[in-house]
Amino acid sequence: MPPELKFRPMTRSELDILVEWAAAEGWNPGFNDAQIFWDTDPQGFIAAELAGELVGGGSIVSYDGRFGFMGFFIMRPDQRGQGLGKRLWFHRRDLLISRLQPPAVIGMDGVFHMQDFYARGGFVYSHRDLRFEGVGALAETDSDLVDLSEVPFEELLRFDNAHFPAPRERFLWAWIGQPGSRALGAKQDGSLHGYGVIRPCRRG
């Protein structure tokens, strides 16, 4: 009888294993990503186990029960093509739904060629993001940009709440203050109109 595929909460050390798998796939995760998202929602990481071994996993982070996000979905290379990932994906979706308050929305990262699969899980294509790599050069900072440390956190939180589906105070505080990063805000007429964070990754 073949071993049973089991789903369970992931441990913090197992998340580091997934980070290594992701890096091997060229995903280029940030150095601090795992800890920040873990601190945001420690229950938001699901492991797939086969015969006592970790064979896959992914995140199902809940923001205050009002918005959920599925990401970091990966299977160990030798366990792909057997339908195990599909079972894990739907388990994660259903578990995240159970953790949210209706009518909360779920977002997700995905790969473009799997849109039909995501659609079968109830997702609708929204937008596409592209990653570019290049060698930076020193340049002057635009006069409208300020260090985010100069912006009161309450003002940043109000701006973020107006543009993100749910409050994420704990995540935001950690995200803008992570080691080695630079966080900038765009101000016009004294008001915050945007912000961004550049963070160190495996490559870049």
Residue ranges and their predicted role:
Residues A47, E53-V61, G68-I74, G185, ...:
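Conserved beta-strand in the GNAT
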Residues L96-V111:
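Conserved GNAT acetyl-CoA-binding A-motif
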Residues G107, Q115-Y118:
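Hydrophobic, ordered structural segments
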Residues G121-R203:
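Amide-forming acyltransferase catalytic core, primarily the GNAT-like/NAT-type
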Residues L15, V19-S59, N161-A183, K187:
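Active-site rim helix/loop that mediates acceptor-substrate recognition in acyltransferases
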Residues L5-K6, P103-I106, D144:
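Short active-site oxyanion
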Residues F72-M75, G81-L96, R120:
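Conserved acetyl-CoA-binding loop-helix of GNAT-fold acetyltransferases
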